[in-house]
Amino acid sequence: MVVMFSIEIRRTFAVRQGLPAPVRDAKNLPPLMPVEGFRVTMRVGFSFEDDQLGERGWFVDTDALDESVDRCAERLASGVWPEIFDFRPSFENVAKWAFTELASTIPQLTYVELDNETIGVATRYVRSH
């Protein structure tokens, strides 16, 4: 049995996805996104084994990762997603983008989750084993 630690870094902010909602539109329902945007918590997780703990008792100092996570969160909150990204910015595609952005700076990154708290739907992009 492999015993591992799992660490999660979280940031909460507002995003404006800006994509059409064909099902809601067909039923003449109002949009789900509030004027101020969806409230989203981004969760960034990484894992490591017991023998990877250093002499300070940690695998990595999470303070060192804050800059990368903050930069990613700021980009997601910086405007309407179709104006920010060159791809169709579904929550799935944006979670994958965030994972790719963070993978180079967060050792052993295992997932990035975008939890849309406004509508109660979370999308998690997970590294496959």
Question: Over which residues does each language-model region extend?
Answer:
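Charge-rich, low-complexity N-terminal segments
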Residues: 1-129
